[in-house]
Amino acid sequence: MFIDRAKIYVKAGDGGNGCIAFRREKFVPKGGPAGGDGGKGGDVIIEADENLDTLLDFHYKRHYYAERGEHGKGKNQKGKDGKDLVIKVPVGTLIFDVETGELLADLVSHGQRVVVAKGGKGGRGNAHFATSTRQTPYFAEKGEKGEERWLYLELKLLADVGLLGLPNAGKSTLLSRISNATPEIAPYPFTTKTPNLGVVEREDITFTVADIPGLIEGAHENKGMGDEFLRHIERTSVLVFVLDAADMVNPPQRAYEILKKELYLYSPKLLEKPRIIAINKIDLPEAQERIPEIEEWLKNEGVPYVFISAKEGINIDKLLELMEKYVKEKKESIPVVEIEKEIEELKQENKKQEIPEIIKEGDLWILKDKKTESLANKLDLYNPQAFSYFLNYAKRRGIIKLINRAKIKDDEEIKIGNYVFKYNSKNNSLELIE
C-alpha cells in the first residue's frame, strides 16, 4: 500500500536528575558534596532512507519516545545519557510542526537527518553548588524535560521527470519501456492507483521518472484522488504529457487542455516547468489517420513533441533524448550550497544573547527569559538553599532590576517558569508563593 501522509507524536528523553550525595569514606573525615550530574535525554531524529518508499508504518505506530537520561549518582558519577531514537522515512519526506505549520525539514537525500525533538539536559549534582559559604549544599538540579511535538509527514516523490496523462493514455507502458519499473498494465482505465517510479539509465546520466496515476477533470479538487497525486510532480524537472492519439472522446488537443487546466488550478507554478508532449499509440490505424491534424496543432503550441508508440517502442529514443536534455539543464542550474557559510551564520545566530523581558497578561506578570526559567524549573525552590541560589542568580542576571523598571507592585504576582512569586520592594527581592 502506498501511503504518503502521516501524523506522529515524538517525545525526546528527559534529562536525568542531579544527585545529592556526600563523600563518606573511612579516611576522609570531612568529605564534601559528591553528587553526580544526570545524563542527557535522547534526541528524536528523523533520517531519510532510500530503501523506503511509503509512510505506511506510521499508520500503525504514531507515538515515538526517546530514552531518558539516567540520574546522577554518588562519588560524582554522571548518569548515562539516553539513547537517541532514529526514525527512518523515505527520501522526499517533508516534516511539518502540526501546531505552527512550520516546515522543519525537507529530506531530499539518503542519510540526511534532522533533530525534531531535543533531549533535555541532565541536572547538575550538588557538587556544583559548593562554595566557601555553602560547603554542604543539600540541593541539586532536576533534569530538563525533553521536547515533544506532533509532526505532519508528507512524502513527495523525488523524480526528475513526471509522466502526466488521462486514464489509459499509456503512461505505465511507457514507464516500463524506458526504465526498470514493472507497473501493472491493463487495457482499461485507472490501472495505476499509486505513483510508480522508474530509473532511466543513459550513456552519461541516470534519472528517475514518475508515472502519476491518470488525471481526470476536477483532479485539483481531489476527484479521482487527483489532489493526492498532483503534489508528487512538484519536484520534477520536466513534465511529459502522454496523450492518446487514438482517443476519440478526449483527443490529444482536448486532453492537453484538461491536463493544463488541472495543473493550473492546483498550482500555477507547475505550468512554469519545461514540457514535452508525447503523442502515444501511433501504431494504431485510427491514430495514424489523425497525425497530420495533430502535428498542425502541435506546431502552434510551441512545445517540444514526439510521436511515439510505447507498446511497439517507436521513437522512444527521441523522447529519451528530450528528457535527458531538460534533466541535464535542470541539474546544471542547481546552485552549489555554501554549507560552511551557512554553518558559520548559524553559529553567529546562536551567539546572540537573549534579552530578558517581563510582560503582563491579565493580572499576572510573566518573565520571558529562557535561562532563568530553565533554572527555576530545574530547582526545588521550596528548598531554602536552592531558593537562595536562585535569588542570587536572578540578581546577577538583572531580573530584579527588570522588575523595578516595570514598576511592579508588592501585591502583584510574577510567573517565572513553573513558579509564581511576589515582589518584596522593601527587601528588593522575590517571595515564593506557596
From Swiss-Prot:
Keywords assigned: Cytoplasm, GTP-binding, Hydrolase, Magnesium, Metal-binding, Nucleotide-binding
GO terms in the biological process aspect are: ribosome biogenesis
GO molecular function terms attached to this record = GTP binding; GTPase activity; magnesium ion binding
Record-annotated OCT domain positions: 347-425
Q: Cross-referenced CDD domains, in alphabetical order?
A: Obg (cd01898)
OBG-type G domain segment(s): 159-328
- Which positions does UniProt annotate for GTP binding? 165-172, 190-194, 211-214, 280-283, 309-311
Q: Where is the Obg domain?
A: 1-158
Top-level taxon of origin: Bacteria
Q: Name one GO cellular component term.
A: cytoplasm
Q: Which positions does UniProt annotate for Mg(2+) binding?
A: 172, 192
UniProt family annotation:
Belongs to the TRAFAC class OBG-HflX-like GTPase superfamily. OBG GTPase family.
**Function according to Swiss-Prot or TrEMBL:** An essential GTPase which binds GTP, GDP and possibly (p)ppGpp with moderate affinity, with high nucleotide exchange rates and a fairly low GTP hydrolysis rate. Plays a role in control of the cell cycle, stress response, ribosome biogenesis and in those bacteria that undergo differentiation, in morphogenesis control.
Q: What is this protein called?
A: GTPase Obg
UniProt lists the gene as obg
